[in-house]
């Protein structure tokens, strides 16, 4: 996540990624599949302006907007029984063009707000079942200082939280940030389980520097996992996915979720159909060409949370607006108990078991033309490896 103040999700590419794009252009050629694998993730594209009236700037709502200890909670979200979420900052090293929170407001929590959140997790009645936190953003590894504050506050006020998960792309965007100072934070709570979700999308991203960063995180005792989107033109291909998951296994990164790309403004050119993702996931799992130990769960991030696409999960289709109705196990009464500020989205229907079903906008498998994709975009030069209109990383 990166956030925006003006509604314009600016392009932000690190010097590390600029160099890698230049190397890919020199080695494979401009517009080669290898170069595109990075450019489609980070280079701002005119197709982001292709927006339909049904598409939204925010995909789902999960913030807890209440006061605790006479102070407003900030950066706290919850959708699930045992897991809470904390966003210390929305700052990222680079801006992923498919970002779930790219259009959210820019914010960074104060130390006091982080401590108040930790007290809430440890003391609030509705958090009695919570034993896991996801620290995300933004990228928490962009601020080791705030991450240390969060670790210390959780140790002091939330002993119920035994697993600390961290979402980051730093190892693949700016791997030099995985330094001794950061590792000292990650090793400061030896009695807690530390898990790091690294979000890697294509095998080309396993650069030597990134492999070294991953090795350092593992040496610090963290368990690494990957959850990432299926992106048209980047990894919507069986051979690419098989190589990606093989490299993950080789470097000690567990497969978690393969997400269908979310239905948000500016995302249409990234989104395949749900069916294509299901077929790719099925071939990974059942073709005999790939180890089942390294396969992901194929999931959709809906208005009510993640839904893993098992047989029977799709219960209806509505061609008029290209949506599908998905069955979930989420009960409305539970959700509103876990998150007192949560409101039922208009996309939700309640089934006869009291569980929520949700309408979800499908994607399309038509390919964009090269001309339409890059029209108006300044390509990276061999000197800088960066589009001339890019922001500094």
Go through each PLM region and give its residues.
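Short secondary-structure boundary/capping elements
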Residues: 68, 80, 112-116, 178, ...
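N-terminal pre-triad scaffold of radical SAM enzymes
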Residues: 70-101
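Phosphate-binding glycine-rich loops and their immediate beta-loop-alpha structural context
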Residues: 99, 113, 139, 154
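Flexible, acidic/Gly-rich N-terminal and inter-domain linker regions that tether
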Residues: 1-78
């Amino acid at each position: 996540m990166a956030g925006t103040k003006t509604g314009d999700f600016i392009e932000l590419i690190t010097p590390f990624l600029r160099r890698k794009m230049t190397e890919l252009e020199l080695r494979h050629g401009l517009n080669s599949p290898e170069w595109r694998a990075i450019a489609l993730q980070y280079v701002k594209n005119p197709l982001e302006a292709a927006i339909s009236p049904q598409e939204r700037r925010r995909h789902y709502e999960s913030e807890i907007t209440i006061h605790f200890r006479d102070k407003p909670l900030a950066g706290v979200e919850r959708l699930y029984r045992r897991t809470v979420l904390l966003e210390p900052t929305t700052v990222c090293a680079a801006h992923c063009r498919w970002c779930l929170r790219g259009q959210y407001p820019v914010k960074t929590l104060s130390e006091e707000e982080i401590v108040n959140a930790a007290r809430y997790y440890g003391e609030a009645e509705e958090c009695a079942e919570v034993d896991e936190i996801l620290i995300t953003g933004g990228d928490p590894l962009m601020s080791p200082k705030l991450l240390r504050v969060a670790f210390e506050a959780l140790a002091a006020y939330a002993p119920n939280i035994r697993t600390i998960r961290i979402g980051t792309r730093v190892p693949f965007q700016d791997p030099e940030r995985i330094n001794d100072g950061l590792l000292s934070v990650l090793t400061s709570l030896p009695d807690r389980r530390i898990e790091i979700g690294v979000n890697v999308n294509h095998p080309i991203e396993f650069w030597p520097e990134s492999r070294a960063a991953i090795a350092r995180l593992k040496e610090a005792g963290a368990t690494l996992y990957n959850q990432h989107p299926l992106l048209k033109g980047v990894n919507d291909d069986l051979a690419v996915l098989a190589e990606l998951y093989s490299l993950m296994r080789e470097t000690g990164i567990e497969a978690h979720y393969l997400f269908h790309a979310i239905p948000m403004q500016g995302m249409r050119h990234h989104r395949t159909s749900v069916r294509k993702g299901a077929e790719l996931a099925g071939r990974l799992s059942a073709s005999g060409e790939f180890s089942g130990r390294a396969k992901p769960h194929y999931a959709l991030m809906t208005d009510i949370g993640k839904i893993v696409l098992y047989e029977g999960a799709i219960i209806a289709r509505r061609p008029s607006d290209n949506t599908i109705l998905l069955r979930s196990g989420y009960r409305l009464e539970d959700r509103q108990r876990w998150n007192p500020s949560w409101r039922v989205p208009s996309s939700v229907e309640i089934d006869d078991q009291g569980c929520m079903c949700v309408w979800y906008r499908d994607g399309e498998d038509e390919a964009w033309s090269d001309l339409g994709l890059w029209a108006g975009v300044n390509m990276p030069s061999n000197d800088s490896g960066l589009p001339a209109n890019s922001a500094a990383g």
